[in-house]
């Protein structure tokens, strides 16, 4: 209850790793749209991101170095540059399942999202 009060959210889900968190997020997004009767399949992720080593997490990772040995991965992922709201808006369609973004990227260097780009993601 304290965690949700601090975050402004109504639920929390604990994971052992970032990979588990990404897999859970993917499943939550699919379940959400399924519950609404929609089958959305597209994922928008940020370039130079790394989300883990499971098939789902690797599918959302842009670096071919990590992806190539495990292909074919999940399809339907579009990568956009960090801090480019126009590219983000162009990538999001009626079929978008989720937007995957780290508040602070670590794979491409320690790069926090700008407040304006974070706000664009929330839109």
Could you describe each region identified by the protein language model?
Residues 47-105, 109-120:
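PLP-dependent aminotransferase-class I/II
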Residues 1-38, 42:
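Glycine-rich loop-to-alpha-helix module at the N-terminal edge of alpha/beta enzyme cores
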Residues 123:
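Active-site loop/helix belt of alpha/beta enzymes
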């Amino acid at each position: 209850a304290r965690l949700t009060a601090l975050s402004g959210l109504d639920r929390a889900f604990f994971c052992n790793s970032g990979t588990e968190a990404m897999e859970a997020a993917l499943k939550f997004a699919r379940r959400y749209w399924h519950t609404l009767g929609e089958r959305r399949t597209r994922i928008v992720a940020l370039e130079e991101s790394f989300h883990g080593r499971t098939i789902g997490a690797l599918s959302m990772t842009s670096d071919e170095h990590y992806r190539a040995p495990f292909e074919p991965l999940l399809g339907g992922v579009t990568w956009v540059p960090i801090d480019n709201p126009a590219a983000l808006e162009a990538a999001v369609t009626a079929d978008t399942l989720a937007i995957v973004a780290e508040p602070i990227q670590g794979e491409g260097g320690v790069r926090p999202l700008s407040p304006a780009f974070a706000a664009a993601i929330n839109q």
